[in-house]
From Swiss-Prot:
Keywords of this entry: Cytoplasm, Methyltransferase, RNA-binding, rRNA processing, S-adenosyl-L-methionine, Transferase
Localization annotation: Cytoplasm
Annotated gene: rsmA
Organism: Pyrococcus furiosus (strain ATCC 43587 / DSM 3638 / JCM 8422 / Vc1)
Name recorded for this polypeptide: Probable ribosomal RNA small subunit methyltransferase A
Similarity comment text for this entry: Belongs to the class I-like SAM-binding methyltransferase superfamily. rRNA adenine N(6)-methyltransferase family. RsmA subfamily.
A GO CC term attached to the entry: cytoplasm
Length: 273
């Protein structure tokens, strides 16, 4: 794959753009691991974000019924259309974070790392069976962190509320060209059954995790502006915020269930909708 990559770079006089996260996956073992982990069948419709030079896309096309590949760089799209004759791959030009996604049931992607957070939050709002996504290793660790872990964050909470995530494979920098400055990891994301998912108020979660090391009551008071509470209102609501469920817990120790209890309490008090 390295030889094929350099052939494309030379043939099309192509220079990767670091600004849009163009680090191309060139290790076949990693590509096969991603495809096998996703357990793709002919009945599957797969979404890929950032197809690059089509090495992963080509494997997906052999196994899936349909592949949608979203690519921002028009130069890449021109190369893919020239070099491959896929009948079941539809390339969509655009920013994956901003455009509407087609319907799919599986995701397999080596995404640009700078869109990791908005991509993941957008993904979790969709119905799908399984996603296998390449992330920066440190981001992946935050995704799979549990309450109380040093990596536990807003991301950890939101992922844990809606899905089960685990690191499938850690990947060194040599698996990409150009080499990124960070290590990577393949992450498997499987949505929880609908009756087990916990839909959380995103503004509340953001407000809490602005101060993840602080006590819940203090975090809410210090982030009250994010909940639409001004300083004058805070004086009258101070006692309520000090008596929310789990007020004396630190934010990074909260489970999704506990955040939901805080949310329901604040709704009853008329503080949030």
């Amino acid at each position: 794959m390295r030889d094929k990559l350099f052939y494309f770079l030379s043939k099309y006089n192509f220079s990767p753009r670091d600004k849009i996260g163009q680090n191309f996956l060139i290790m076949r073992d990693v590509i096969i691991k991603a495809v096998e982990t996703s357990e793709i069948k002919k009945s599957d419709v797969v979404l890929e974000v950032g197809p690059g030079f089509g090495f992963l896309t080509d494997e997906l096309s052999k196994r899936a019924g349909k592949v949608y590949a979203i690519e921002l760089d028009k130069r890449i799209i021109e190369i893919l259309e020239n070099e491959y004759n896929w009948e079941n791959v539809e390339i969509i030009q655009g920013d994956a974070v901003k455009i509407e996604w087609p319907e799919f049931n599986k995701v397999v992607s080596n995404i640009p790392y700078q869109i990791s957070s908005p991509f993941t939050f957008k993904l979790l709002k969709h119905d799908f069976e399984k996603a296998v996504v390449m992330y920066q290793l440190e981001f992946a660790k935050r995704m799979v962190a549990k309450p109380g872990d040093r990596n536990y964050s807003r991301l950890s909470l939101m992922v844990n509320a809606l899905a089960n995530a685990k690191i499938v494979m850690k990947i060194g920098r040599g698996a990409f060209y150009p080499k990124p400055k960070v290590d990577s990891a393949l992450v498997l994301i499987v949505p929880k059954p609908k009756d087990e998912r916990i839909e959380l108020n995103e503004n509340l979660v953001k407000a809490l995790f602005q101060h993840r090391r602080k006590l819940v009551s203090k975090a809410l008071k210090e982030s009250c502006h994010m909940l639409g509470i001004n300083k004058k209102e805070l004086k009258t609501l101070k006692n309520i915020l000090e008596n929310v469920p789990h007020a004396k817990k630190r934010v990074f120790e909260l489970t999704p269930e506990e955040v939901k209890e805080i949310e329901e309490f604040l709704k009853i008090q008329g503080i949030i909708n």
